[in-house]
A protein has these predicted regions:
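A conserved cap/lid and substrate-binding interface adjacent to the catalytic center
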Residues: 1-56, 74-82, 106-107, 194
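Short glycine-centered, acidic/aromatic-flanked micro-motifs in structured strand/loop junctions
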Residues: 55-58, 87
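Gly/Ala-rich beta-loop-alpha elbow adjacent to hydrolase catalytic centers
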Residues: 57-61, 65
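Generic hydrophobic alpha-helical membrane-span motif
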Residues: 64-67, 123
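The feature captures the conserved acid-bearing segment of alpha/beta-hydrolase catalytic domains
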Residues: 77-157
Length: 195
């Protein structure tokens, strides 16, 4: 992820009228959405009209998953009560208006955060007014089977990961004791940081 591009830019891409989101996240989502994902989604929806729609992602994928869920919900492409969003290490995507719009559209939305993962705290809320949508599930531990967690239904709760100051990028690399950073181990010859 081009972290400087992400954290140093105000949310400028318009979403749903008055809401603003980070252009880097929006462009990444929109590139995939308009390159065939939307058509594939609609085809699968028509073949399976009774299914729920589960959308998930980690890091940039979490931001894109949030935008996908909000896009599908706001354009009424799927019943709202059947949209389920679960992300891992999702960064802040947009402004308060986006967070409120997201909250009003998607009732089943959970941002899972591992211990001191730094990336859910980027871009900082005090820069350009970025704000998370709800709800947060915070594991202030190693995320082993049976480990305790705290659920916070507010958008930016001091009872969850906002209460910690010892942020660490290493906690972003594994969730539930599974290594999720593919660039180190997966996709031989693929460089996710290359344009």
């Amino acid at each position: 992820m081009e972290i400087i591009d992400v954290i140093s830019i105000a949310p400028t891409a318009e979403f749903g009228g008055k809401a603003k989101v980070n252009h880097y996240f929006y462009n990444a989502f929109n590139e995939l959405w308009t390159s065939g994902i939307k058509d594939d989604f609609l085809s699968l929806k028509n073949k399976n009209p009774d299914y729920e729609l589960w959308i998930t992602g980690h890091s940039l994928g979490g931001a894109m998953a949030s935008l996908a869920a909000a896009t599908i919900a706001s354009t009424k492409l799927f019943p709202l009560d059947k949209i389920k969003l679960v992300t891992f290490g999702e960064p802040r995507i947009g402004d308060k208006t986006y967070a409120e719009l997201h909250d009003s559209l998607i009732s089943y939305a959970y941002r899972i955060i591992h211990h001191h993962d730094i990336f859910p705290h980027e871009p900082p809320s005090w820069i350009y007014g970025y704000q998370h949508h709800k709800s947060e599930v915070w594991y202030d531990n190693d995320m082993a089977v049976g480990d305790a967690y705290v659920e916070c239904d507010e958008d930016e709760s001091k009872k969850c990961s906002e209460s910690t100051v010892n942020l660490n990028p290493m906690d972003h690399q594994s969730y539930y004791n599974v290594k999720v950073i593919f660039a180190n181990d997966g996709c031989a010859g693929f460089n996710p940081y290359k344009n």
